Regions:
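Short hydrophobic beta-strand element within catalytic cores of glycosyltransferases
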Residues: 254-257
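Conserved acidic donor-binding segment of nucleotide-sugar-dependent glycosyltransferases
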Residues: 269-270, 274-281, 289-296
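A short helix/loop element that forms part of the nucleotide-sugar donor recognition site in Leloir-type
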Residues: 134-148
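Conserved donor-binding/catalytic core segment of Leloir-type glycosyltransferases
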Residues: 148-164, 170-173, 185
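Donor nucleotide-sugar binding/catalytic pocket of nucleotide-sugar-dependent glycosyltransferases
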Residues: 66-69, 91-137, 211-212
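A short, histidine- and acid-enriched strand-loop-helix "catalytic/donor-clamping" loop
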Residues: 15, 65-84, 96-99
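Nucleotide-activated donor-binding/catalytic signature segment of Leloir-type glycosyltransferases, i.e.
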Residues: 197-215
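Short alpha-helical donor nucleotide-sugar binding micro-motif in glycosyltransferases
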Residues: 214-215, 222-227
Length: 354
């Protein structure tokens, strides 16, 4: 641990109410015991709504300990009445912290505007980022997945859950003018999967959409590489970053995302991706259809946008940018090369913390 001593107290997931109660008791007792009988400089608490009371107890016992919290979901942006119950406790705990880690500039704004946290107490760290040794464009991905290499592929990767926007995606697909010209893939599982299957039947898309269960990271990279247009239709306010959008960008997808929440932290509309109105399947459909007439000829347009996606999602990691330039150099016109050079200058000044 690079010279640091780290002890971990973790709350294990339980399904039953009794199991959850026992899990919390065990978690609290272990955490308090560790802090009482060891000298720690820092207490790092992940998901503040579950740890707020514990932080208060430990700060009472050990006033000198510095507290770092990581907020990243409905712990600070409630989605329902159950989440709302924890917000007063969270608000009363925040004055005790020394540093708040957030995954995006969107969540930085939430913590400043809704919780009154000072900017100097907030640090942006994008959820560990992306493993670019895994998430990169894979050649012949469509063939490897037994998809038609001559058809554009439109995809959704994510869970079938409330507010994830899978039904918005299906509405957009149902409105495609010539849906048979495309191939549609959906990857994921979730409690609303049967509802998704019913909606697919209602829209008569059974022979159009190919569904796959959730995949490993390496397998996901293959799907992203096969997808030309990746749709990220979330309308969850608590989607703090949305790693799927960044993973898709790293693999060369054109990303069309809801203009809200986490994706607004890294997508620049019409530069490295596109926005549509949240919960608006018609607008998403129009963005998909409009893609046919965008910037340069079709091949060069795709290369241009792959560059944007790789450059921004790699956060200027040179080896990935150079690999892209070597791979596509011969296929780019002089004008495209000039525009990419200008875009590199613009990207290099892109402030990830604002």
């Amino acid at each position: 641990n690079n010279g640091y001593q780290v002890d971990v107290s973790a709350l294990k997931k339980k399904d039953s109410k009794l199991g959850k109660l026992g899990g919390y008791l065990s978690f609290y007792i272990k955490s308090i015991f560790l802090c009482l009988f060891h000298h720690y400089d820092y207490l790092y608490a992940h998901y503040i709504s579950h740890c707020a009371l514990l932080i208060k107890i430990i700060k009472k016992l050990k006033p000198s300990i510095k507290v770092i919290v990581n907020v990243h979901g409905n712990d600070v942006v409630p989605e329902d009445a159950h989440d709302e119950k924890f917000i007063p406790l969270v608000k009363s705990t925040l004055p005790l912290i020394d540093l708040c880690i957030v995954p995006s500039s969107y969540y930085q704004k939430v913590m400043m505007e809704q919780y009154g946290l000072n900017e100097d107490k907030i640090k942006i760290f994008p959820s560990g980022g992306i493993n670019f040794d895994v998430f990169q464009e894979i050649e012949n991905a469509k063939e490897k997945l037994h998809l038609d290499p001559n058809k554009k592929c439109i995809g959704y990767i994510g869970r079938y859950e409330k507010r994830k926007g899978w039904e918005v995606f299906l509405e957009a697909i149902s409105l495609l003018e010539n849906v048979e010209q495309y191939q549609i893939v959906m990857v994921g599982v979730g409690e609303d999967e049967e509802k998704a299957n019913a909606l697919i039947q209602e829209y008569h898309l059974e022979n159009v959409i190919k569904k796959y269960p959730m995949q490993t990271q390496k397998e996901l990279a293959l799907f992203y590489s096969a997808i030309d247009i990746f749709c990220f239709p979330t309308y969850r306010k608590s989607d703090s970053l949305g790693l799927v959008g960044l993973e898709a960008m790293a693999c060369g997808c054109i990303v069309i995302a809801s203009n809200m929440a986490g994706p607004t932290s890294y997508i620049k509309d019409q530069e490295n991706g596109f926005f549509f109105k949240p919960r608006d399947g018609k607008d998403l459909n129009q963005k998909i259809e409009d893609d046919k007439t965008m910037y340069y000829n079709e091949t060069e347009s795709l290369i241009w946008r792959i560059f944007n996606c790789v450059y921004f999602s790699a956060r200027q990691e040179e080896k990935y940018v150079k690999n892209f330039e070597i791979k596509y150099k011969k296929q780019l016109s002089k004008q495209a090369k000039k525009d990419i050079a200008i875009n590199k200058m613009n990207a290099s000044s892109f402030n990830w913390e604002k």
